[in-house]
Amino acid sequence: MNAEILAVGTELLMGQIANTNAQYISKRLNDIGVNVYYHSVVGDNSVRLKKCLLAALERCDLVIMTGGLGPTQDDLTKETVAEVLGKKLVLHEESLERIKTFFTRINRKMTDNNVKQAYLPEGCTVVENNSGTAPGCIIEDKGKIVVMLPGPPPEMMPMLDDTVIPYLAEKSGYRIVSKYLRVFGIGESQLEEMIMDLVDKQDRVTIATYAKDGQVTVRLTTKARTEEEGFREILPLQNEIASRLKEALYSTEDEELEYVAAKMLIDNNITIATAESCTGGLISARLTDVPGISKVFNRGIVSYSNEAKMENLGVKPETLEKYGAVSSRTAMEMAEGVRKIASTDIGLAVTGIAGPDGGTDEKPVGLVYVALAHSLGTEVRELRLAGNRNRIRNLTVLNAFDMVRRYVMKLKG
């Protein structure tokens, strides 16, 4: 089965919002073995929408449309699909009741134009919307399948996952099963060299690598009738790659690095406190994104100025005077200071120059020090990072979590 994703909305063409739906839908279709051949975007114009839909139906078996299901006059998706397929729009009483219940629940008056959203093409399969008012639908007609879903991602995504994907999976007969191995501390080119012989002889299980935000993902993919069968076929290759990557491999479940590090702290009851300068609280923010972190996360201190480093963390004035705020020695004293103040098992600290200003020949933009203080001593990682301010800060955070992860691994043997 091949597919086209057709996004409807003038706001997409004007660049007011990004079409993140297409990326999400493509990934989910790939998971069940549906090939996505085209992404299209069209504005809120019935003539152009009709042309795009006809073209999509001509070249694909499946068309998934997002947007244009709302209550206003420029929401034209259902009307256009009904016209193209020769279907009538009929009132779906159950959907109307759900819309009324939604407005009652949020304590808002339901306007008359919202009734429009309960009119659906005759004979369709209704896709319930538990997060908004616009129901979606699936229509099968002359060997083609048209799916209509609302545009807002918080509404579209659960509707796709809970109803549309299971519906389509039954028809495909097989699914694409993928395993994602997440790696940090090895570049993409170095990683490829380490597994090139496996890439050269790949067969039923294919290997792909891609880098993003300082991390590398290895995707292992196969086709199978069931997910269990697919994972079973992938496992030998997964184990071989894991044995080569060793501690650089931090997840086989497509998890974020900060989540893995935080879970290791929680599972091993290792308490932590943080001291941040150039990252301005990003480490603390990402820690607190992880459920259960309150068991081990004591506090986070943002010590941006030299005065704050001395007053809040006990960094020595002579250290700052001799070595500067961005130095290995200052990072060490920050980590040791926050660990002592909080009485935690480990203290994590970062200091650096994120730019775009503040760099010198001796200490350029991108120079960062990450320090981890623990019962065995204090270790420091010097980083020379490239990119804009946001990238440098993000890579600093990832390196900090990587230090924590590797420390816990070493501690537990």
From Swiss-Prot:
Disulfide bonds: none annotated. It comes from the Bacteria. SUPFAM superfamilies: CinA-like, Molybdenum cofactor biosynthesis proteins. InterPro entries: CinA, CinA-like_C, CinA_C, CinA_KH, Competence-induced_CinA, MoaB/Mog-like_dom_sf, MoaB/Mog_dom. CDD domains: cinA (cd00885). It holds the Pfam family CinA_KH. Signal peptide: none annotated. Belongs to the CinA family. This is Putative competence-damage inducible protein. The gene is cinA.
